[in-house]
Amino acid sequence: MMTFRFLQLIPPYSFRTLSFTFSRIAYLLVFVASFSIFYSCSTSRHASTITDYRALAKASRKLGVRIDYKDNHRLFLECAQWVGVPYRYGGKSRRGVDCSGLTYCIYRQLYGVSLSPNSQMQLDRDVQVRVKKGHVTPGDLLFFSDRRSKRHINHVGIYLKGGKFIHASTSRGVRIDDLQDAHWKKRWVAAGRTAGKRF
C-alpha cells in the first residue's frame, strides 16, 4: 500500500523525464564503448602497419631493391628470408637449398603451387606463359644455361625488380644478382609464369 501511495504522489511527467534521462545515459554508454573499440582497433592496425614497414625496410636492404606500396610485399618478405641460406644439392629447406628447390619453396609458400623438381622441368612443365626479358615482372621464373646451344636448362631464379633476381648459387648460396651482369646476360635463356602466380 505504501508503494502504491508513493507512486501516486509522483507526477506523470517525472516518469517521462526519468525515461528520457536513462535513454541519454544508455546512448552515452554505447558511444563510449564504440569509441573504445574503434580506438583499440586503430591502435592495433597502426602497430601492425609500423611492423610491416620495418619488415619491408629490412627486406629492401637485404634484397637491394626499392619496395613500393603497390608491390607484392609477400614476395619480397618471403625472398628476404632466404638470402644467405647455404647451397645444398636437392635441398628444400633453410638448412640448405639448390636453385630449383628455392623456387619450389617460395612458390609453394606464396602461391600454393608445387613446381617440378628441377629447372628444366619447371620450364617445360610448369611455365604456362613465356615472357620476354624486357617484360618480366616480380615473381617471374628466370631460366639460364651454361651450354652453348642453350637447349639444356641448368639454373633457375625468381625475378624481383630493377633487374635484380634471387637464386641459389652453388658456390655462394642464396643471393641476389643483376640480370645486366655479363655472366647472366650470356647465360640467359627465358622467363615465364605459372598458372598459379598472382600479382
Predicted feature residues:
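N-terminal secretory signal peptides that target proteins for export/translocation
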Residues: 1-22
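Sec-dependent signal peptide recognition
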Residues: 5, 24-31
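C-terminal motif of bacterial Sec signal peptides marking the signal peptidase cleavage site
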Residues: 37-40
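Aromatic- and glycine-rich peptidoglycan recognition patches
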Residues: 42-51, 56-67, 130-133, 152-199
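Post-signal-peptide N-terminal segment of Sec-exported extracytoplasmic proteins
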Residues: 48, 54-95
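Catalytic cysteine-centered active-site loop
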Residues: 62-66, 85-138, 189
